[in-house]
């Protein structure tokens, strides 16, 4: 059992920047709009499991999985990623004009915008937005969406937006319980899977 725990921890250390990259990527999707001070509009929290796979054109593949908890009061947000043992591996905290990513080893990345944080963490620009809406079962209105398919209640099931192909399913009152996001970039393909288990 101890050996298995050590193996998991080692794998997470090896893949730490991939996890941090996912954290920054999700934060980049969660740009917080300027809102009047004290407003609770848009407040929500979601949690569950995540898995991210990055496949290089050479066929080399990196993958990491764990848990996520997202707390958002409409102006500030906090996103935690945990390893399979439940330890926090990365945390992103953000507000308009500032975003910070802190890894478990104390490494800190800071940027004016979540998108800049994504570029610093992943090493390439990923101008994404919308996950904040997607987690609620909405297509973001700040970018055009293509190939939109909806269910009988008008909730989006699949669409393309900001370079991502998104599939949403297993809806509850708060939004989709499963999000599968795929993005193809020069030299690599990224697949992110979020399974929500907490409202």
From Swiss-Prot:
GO terms for cellular component: cell outer membrane. GO terms for biological process: lipoprotein localization to outer membrane; protein transport. Transmembrane segments: none annotated. Belongs to the LolB family. Monomer. Plays a critical role in the incorporation of lipoproteins in the outer membrane after they are released by the LolA protein. This is Outer-membrane lipoprotein LolB. It comes from Bordetella petrii (strain ATCC BAA-461 / DSM 12804 / CCUG 43448).
